[in-house]
Amino acid sequence: MAQLYFYYSAMNAGKTTALLQSSYNYQERGMRTVLYTADMNSRDNRYKQIKSRIGLYASARVFNIKTNFFDQVVTIHQKDIIHCVLVDECHFLNRNQVIDLSKIVDVLNIPVLCYGLRTDFRADLFSGSLWLLAWADKLIELKTICYCGRKANRVLRIDDQGLIIRDGNQILVGGNNRYVSVCRKHFVEQLESPLSLTKRVYKNR
């Protein structure tokens, strides 16, 4: 039986690499996959390249807040059988889209693998993550580490000087270099510290 999977982590845990590897595993066995990634400023049915930090890449359909995953996958599936749907940056999904993905699993019997962040720089859940935590059949945490060596499960947003940013929009387009993954302990300490992240890391060594 197909299932809906949610692979979540802090930043730089290899989510995109894991997605591309999973897609490759299907394709290596002659099975067809459909990949999606977020682009909130594009129209449906356009394509975008998914690229991992280690250089792996693949073409993917883009989704925005208007994308109907179920209708799209039904149309594609009728022309050529789909064996797996994989969604990158799934934290940008909304409630209806998560339900769409569950229908792909339950009605079409196609597994859906979603990869994304669980929480933002304030440790608040993203919309997509909230609904996937409620609707997914399987929850899998992908692990990365804090500068102290503990498991990182939070992200901090920083400015050019390494100072912690505590307020602002939840989504910062193209701002991956503005985030640092840390453990819960150092997430709280950083929010309470006047030091820049760089000075704080040096002090803790």
Curated annotation (Swiss-Prot):
It catalyses: thymidine + ATP = dTMP + ADP + H(+). Its EC number is 2.7.1.21. ATP binds at residues 9-16, 88-91. It holds the Pfam family TK. GO terms for molecular function: ATP binding; thymidine kinase activity; zinc ion binding. GO terms for biological process: DNA biosynthetic process; thymidine metabolic process. Keywords: ATP-binding, Cytoplasm, DNA synthesis, Kinase, Metal-binding, Nucleotide-binding, Transferase, Zinc. GO terms for cellular component: cytosol. Zn(2+) binds at residues 146, 148, 183, 186. Its main location: cytoplasm. Belongs to the thymidine kinase family. Homotetramer. This is Thymidine kinase. It comes from Blochmanniella pennsylvanica (strain BPEN).
